[in-house]
Structures are given as C-alpha cells and as structure tokens.
Regions:
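Radical SAM enzyme core and accessory elements
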Residues: 2-9, 29-30, 44, 49-159, ...
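A structural motif corresponding to the C-terminal lobe/cap of the Radical SAM core domain
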Residues: 2-12, 20, 40-42, 49, ...
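Structural motif
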Residues: 3, 203-206, 381
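Glycine-rich beta-alpha loop elements in corrinoid/cobalamin-binding modules
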Residues: 11-14, 19-53, 79, 86-119, ...
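Flexible loop/turn segments at secondary-structure boundaries
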Residues: 12-15, 44-45, 212-216, 242-244, ...
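Short, acidic/polar
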Residues: 188-195, 245-250, 363-372, 420-427, ...
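Radical SAM [4Fe-4S] cluster-binding motif and immediate context
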Residues: 302-473
Length: 703
C-alpha cells in the first residue's frame, strides 16, 4: 500500500503550522490513505537556533569588515550561553524568564537593538512577557544577520532563497545553486528529512510550496531524496507553482520531482495514490488536465495530528498589537470558504481557482470543524485565512459559536463593505473576533472604482468605525503605484490613511507596491488600465509579474519610501500632525483632501439603527434581572440599571427570552407584533428611543 509523507519545507512560518498539509492529510485520511505530515520549517529553525549549531556558525570567518558582525562575534559566549533558553522561552516552555530577559542585561545586543532606544519605553506599550518576546526576536534577527554573512545569503527566519525564486525565467537559474555543495543549514535540513523518511518509510513524498521563499529548500530536499531514495516518488504543489508555473515548458524541475500539482491538491494526490487518471498535474511527459474538483465540503476539516505543537516559536517583530498577530500566537489556520465571494478586483489573480471558485459550507458544519481542530491541537485560537470572509457567513458562524457556548478567539480577512454594521461587529466580537484585515488599497474613490474594488472610502470608513467601536482591531492593506495613479493621488491617499489613524479606525497597515500579474484583469488587459506591456515574452519556467510601461512622471521609489516612513510613525502613534507632503523627498504637492473627510463620514448613521421588519433581533447577554422600576442588564465587566415603564419591562423580558434562542430567527416584524400585546404605543418609536440604544452594547442586536 502507498504511504504519503506531506512536508512543509523551510521556511514558511514558525509560530504555528501552515495549514496546507493538514487539509490534505484530513481529506486523504478520511479516504482511507496512509498519510503522515512533517513541518521541517519549524524543526529546522529550532536546529539552527541552538547552541550546537551556533558554535559551528561562530567558527566560520566573517567576510570583509563589518562592525556589527564583529560585535556579535565578540559576544560569542553570551550568545551560545543564552540561545537554548531563548528558544525555550519563545516556545512557551519557560515563561518565568521574561523578567530576566527584560532587565536589558541578559541578552547580548547588536545592531537590531539600536532602533528601540530606551528599553523602559517598551513597557508603556507592552507587558513583561510581550516585551521579552520582542527583545528575543531582535536577538534572533541579529543572529540571522551573522548566519547570512557566514553560512548562506539565502537565510531568513521565515523564508529561504526568496530572491532566487522571485523571477526565474528558466529552471537553470535556480539549478546553478542546486549543483553547489550543501551549506550547513541545508545539511541539517536533510538530516531532519532523513529522520522522517526512516520513521515513516513513505513511498511518496509531497512538498507544499506556498511561497517563493520555500522553493529552494523544497528542491534541496527533493534532490536529497532522488540521490538517496530513488524509489520514492516526489510531488510538489501549492501557491507558488499554482501561480507561477502554470505555463511551464521548461522540464528541468523533473530532475528533482515526479509530479507538479496545480491548484487544490486533494484530488490530484488521491489520483496519484490510487494510480488513477492524473488531474491538474505536470509530469516529465507533459501536462495532464483531467477532470474533477473536490468541493469545500468534501475537503472537510484539516487534521493537524502529528505536527510538533511544542516546537513553534512566538515572535514579536513589532510592538504594534495588531501587526504582531502574524508572528505571535499559535493560531489554528482554517478557511471558512473556498475562493472569494467578490472575485472582481483588477489587481487580484481572479482567474485562478483559489480565488475564482467560491464555495462555502453551513455555519454549523464549519463550527463542527472548529471543535474538531480544538480537540486535535488543544488551542482555541483561530486565524481564518480566507481571501475575504463573507459577512453573511461570519454572522451565522458567530451565532453558532454563541449558541454552543464555545469559547474561542479568531481573526480573519474581510472586505470593508457596508454589510459590516455596528451590530454585526458587536456580534462578531461577542463570538471571539479580535481583529480583521482588509484592503483599503489606494484609498482613492477614483482608483477604487477603476480597480473594481466594490467599496469606496465612505463604506470603508463606516465598516472600520463599526469594527473599532466593537473593540475589534483593524489592519489595512494599502497599495501604491496602481496604473494612472498620480503623485497628487499618492499624497491624498496618505492623507486619508492619516485621518483614519487619527480617528482610531486603523491599528496597523502595510503599503504594497502594485504588481501586475498575468492572472489578474489588469494583467490580462493592461491597455484598459492606461498602460501597456513592456513585452509579450513568456518565460519557459516561471511567469507571474508583468512588466509594463507607464508615463508616470514621478519617482515611484521615492513615493514608496515616503509612504513607508509615514506609516512607520503612524503605527507608533506619532507623526499624525505632520502635513503629509512633508514625508516625501523632493517637490511634492500638498494634499487636496478635505481635513474633515473621515470625521464627516464617521457621524453617518449606522444601518443597525434603521428599522427593518425583516431584520433579525437577538439577545446575546445574560438573562435580565427585573426590578421595580426597570431592568438590570449585566455585561462582562459591569451592570447597568435601566428604567422602563411597567409595560416596557414586561415586553423586554419576553423579547429577550425569545431573542436569546439563537437556533431560530426572530424578526423585528415579530417583535413589533409582540409589542402590541403590551402597549398601544408605536414600537418603532420605542425602537428609535435612547433606551433601545443603551441596550445595544449590552447585547440587544439587529443583524
């Protein structure tokens, strides 16, 4: 019988498992196949950051003269004495070390520490444990600088050889590295792989390659297997080949692997394991399209069994509480729905299956999966990695979580659209939502319309306001350099972002420079967006980014530097009063955005306060307590006494009891009918009263 070993190669992420192998394992195990999985990414990082390996690194010669590296070398004994303790702390094994780490004298400090200034300032932003994680992360980054200089330039904590894989016209470009002798990191990587092969004895090994930064490591592992286990068949798939290698004509990669899978890997791997007809798979003989797809429901619950949960490291690369979610915390990564429910943005790879094909499952099914993953991992923290989670499904999932009394925390990606009302955001927060990330992109209504984003600044502002008021942190993905964007619009976009930070709508953000890709609407038809391709050449190996020509009239590099510098200050809470044009080098126009643009949008009424007889009313608070002159409503941290007329009290007791049954829909039309049993007054007038407003944050919601 075939046995499959699924491998996450170095380096993807170190704080929690990347979910690809877990989803594949879950599906294939339910189909009766023998499947094991391994995360070489986290296992190798633990080996690299160990006393044994660092002793070997410090024995290597530092090339040239570098004052910072020489300082690290001079503190060799401090690094080798502390490294194992630091890794144990970051794995959560020895939290008591936090106080010692924060003294400022325990860890050796080199160049990465220079930007933080006085360590005592950190305690105004972070608690002791978080401060210690932040300092340990700087410490590992200093060591990474040494490793890059002495062992291999390809090393970074969460990527390996990324620049090699970013634009490979032919496979020979990366093979020039593969024919070189292995460096010490690659040797350790293959030693870890050897242990997995010996323990599991697979007949097939599958590598997930989600990003360019793990292609080289995956190929090194495959090379090792071909040399030492030529009978093992090797498959590779994931985001990188599905995006960049779809039109591949260069067959050089098949000297290292046997199958290259595109898009979702469940069915292709099932066919390989069962010796069936290949689907969406390259072999050295050519491409096999085949037929069939696995639905999101059939894909089912991921299975994280077998992954080394005690070895993941929580890192803090920034003091910003929202920005650090990507590297801090052991999140169970899951996908609510397959694809994007919008799938129309001009910059997005909307022609690819993982975006284009939208499928979902009922909320109850998804929450069943969540409970199963909790049993597997012991963790109640989730990151839903959807391209954009659907608001309607988030509402139903939140209701199901509350109905079951499930205690979880979660964050996800969204579109900042009008359906995120104030009450929906309160519902999501009550169900454990702590943060959302979404695209504000160019922050220009003209360009948002041109890129078919489907939202405008006004909608985004209201959605962000509602998330923020509900206590949900907000991260904004930002973009510059979109075709036809002027220098004035670049300045104005920064002003919009400044006002949003000033208003407390955004907790963190990141600027991306627009890249035209072959799978996006803008890459398919550049002329429709006011630019033209530089050439129509198709590479034999990887094809993704499209070079284009535009009469821009300004230095896009300087614009990017200004935007990044401003954002760095905004996320630290300063620079918000500085005129935005002053962040840019050279002659730059002042903003043309009205100084009160965002403030004016924030005072617009929320859709949750517009009476809709078809809307659902829910009560998610504890049972109210009747008093002589009204009700006492208990929140998590306080209680509020509200005075009502006797008939209002009786109505609300009945309403809240009925609306607390989250298994059935109770509408405002039904609530109005119920009100007529207690009063001849207008229900709408009562609904629009200050009394009703006071009950909303305590759990009386319109969704």
């Amino acid at each position: 019988m075939e046995k499959l070993l699924l491998v996450t190669p170095p380096f993807v992420q170190v704080n929690c498992p990347y979910p690809a192998t877990a989803y594949l394992s879950g599906y294939l195990r339910r189909r009766g196949f023998d499947v094991a999985q391994a995360d070489l990414s986290v296992e190798l990082i633990g080996t690299v950051f160990s006393r044994d390996f660092l002793e070997r690194v410090f024995d290597l010669r530092i090339p040239g003269e570098d004052e910072n590296l020489e300082r690290i070398q001079a503190m060799r004994t401090r690094y080798t004495a502390t490294i194992d303790a630091v890794v144990d702390f970051l794995r959560g094994r020895d939290p008591g070390l936090a106080q010692l780490i924060c003294t400022g004298e325990f860890l050796p400090q080199a160049g990465r520490f220079e930007a933080i200034g006085d360590l005592s300032d950190l305690f105004g932003t972070l608690g002791t444990a978080e401060c210690a994680k932040f300092l340990c992360t700087l410490y590992l980054q200093d060591l990474s600088d040494l490793i890059r200089a002495t062992v291999t330039e390809h090393f970074e904590i969460v990527r390996y050889g990324e620049r090699l894989a970013m634009a490979i016209g032919s496979f020979a470009e990366i093979e020039t590295v593969l024919v070189e002798p292995m460096n010490p990191i690659e040797e350790r990587m293959c030693e870890l792989l050897e242990r997995k092969i010996t323990a599991e004895r697979p007949t097939i090994v599958g590598f997930t390659i989600p990003f360019p930064g793990c292609l080289l490591a995956a190929l090194r592992c495959a090379q090792y297997l071909k040399q030492h286990y030529p009978g093992i068949r090797i498959a590779a798939g994931g985001g990188y080949p599905s995006t960049e290698l779809r039109t591949m004509s260069d067959r050089g990669i098949f000297r290292y692997i046997d199958y290259l899978i595109l898009d979702d890997g469940e069915l292709p791997l099932e066919r390989i394991l069962s010796d069936g007809e290949l689907v969406r798979t390259y072999t050295r003989d050519g491409y096999h399209e085949g037929e069939g797809n696995v639905t999101h429901k059939e894909r089912g619950c991921p299975d994280f069994t077998g992954l080394p949960f005690d070895r993941y490291l929580s890192l803090l690369e920034t003091t910003n509480p929202m920005h650090r979610l990507w590297t801090d915390g052991r999140w169970n990564k899951m996908t609510i729905a397959h694809g994007c429910y919008w799938a129309k943005c001009a910059f997005c790879d909307t022609s690819l299956d993982y975006i284009r094909r939208y499928e979902s499952v009922p909320a109850a099914t998804f929450v069943d999966w969540m409970e199963e993953v909790i049993r597997q991992t012991g963790s109640r923290s989730f990151h839903f990695t959807d391209e954009a989670a659907p608001p309607k499904l988030l509402k139903e999932i939140s209701l199901e979580i509350l109905r079951r009394g499930l205690c979880v925390s979660w964050w996800t990606n969204v579109r900042f659209e009008s359906r995120y009302t104030g009450d929906l955001c309160l519902l999501m927060a009550a169900a454990g939502c702590i943060a959302v990330s979404g695209g504000l992109e160019v922050a220009s209504d003209r360009l948002l319309k041109k890129m078919n984003k489907g939202v405008d600044i006004a909608q985004a502002t209201l959605a962000m306001r509602n998330f923020s008021y509900a206590g949900i942190m907000v991260h904004a993905y930002l973009m510059y350099g979109f075709p036809t964007q002027t220098l004035q619009e670049s300045v104005d976009s920064l002003e919009v972002v400044r006002q949003m930070f000033r208003a407390g709508l955004i907790d963190s953000a990141f600027w991306h420079r627009y890249a035209m890709t072959v799978h996006s609407p803008s890459g398919t038809d550049p002329e429709a967006f006011g630019v033209r391709r530089r050439n129509a050449h198709v590479h034999a190996f990887a094809n993704n980014e499209v070079a284009f020509v535009e009469n821009r009239g300004y230095d896009i590099r300087l614009v990017g530097e200004g935007l990044d510098e401003a954002l760095r200050h905004y996320m630290a809470g300063d620079g918000l009063d500085r005129p935005v044009h002053k962040w840019f080098a050279g002659k730059t126009p002042r903003t043309a955005v009205d100084a009160s643009l965002i403030a004016d949008q924030m005072i617009r009424p929320d859709a949750s306060r517009l009476f809709d007889e078809n809307a659902r009313v829910v009560w998610i608070g504890p049972p109210p307590v009747r008093q002589e002159d009204g009700l006492v409503l208990h929140g998590a941290s306080s209680a509020r006494k509200l005075k009502f007329k006797p008939h209002e009290t009786e109505f609300l007791l009945c309403l809240m009891q009925t609306a607390s049954d989250l298994s059935r829909k109770f509408t405002f039309g039904e609530a109005a009918e119920l009100f007529r049993h207690y009063s001849e007054e207008s229900f709408v007038a009562f609904y629009l009263s200050k009394k009703w407003d006071l009950m909303r944050p305590l759990g009386l919601l319109q969704i």
